[in-house]
Amino acid sequence: MAKTIVIKQIGSPIRRPEKQRQTLIGLGLNKMHKTRELEDTPAVRGMINKIPHMVQIIEEKG
């Protein structure tokens, strides 16, 4: 079974650069306090590291 990671959006995309908004959309987040469970891959980790002020890692599974 693959490792998964649960992330939560804690920052608003309002008044943020377009690249940061697109990164949120790429992670499947678009509303405040929404959570997603994603596969823990280098691509997902890289996207999270680009916007650490807007997302929070809730839990790492596996």
UniProtKB/Swiss-Prot annotation:
Recorded GO MF terms: structural constituent of ribosome
Regions that span the bilayer: none
Matching InterPro entries: Ribo_uL30_ferredoxin-like_sf, Ribosomal_uL30_bac-type, Ribosomal_uL30_ferredoxin-like
Keyword terms of this UniProt record: Ribonucleoprotein, Ribosomal protein
GO CC list: cytosolic large ribosomal subunit
Xref: HAMAP family: Ribosomal_uL30_B
Family of this protein: Belongs to the universal ribosomal protein uL30 family.
Record-given protein name: Large ribosomal subunit protein uL30
Organism, scientific name: Dinoroseobacter shibae (strain DSM 16493 / NCIMB 14021 / DFL 12)
Gene for this chain: rpmD
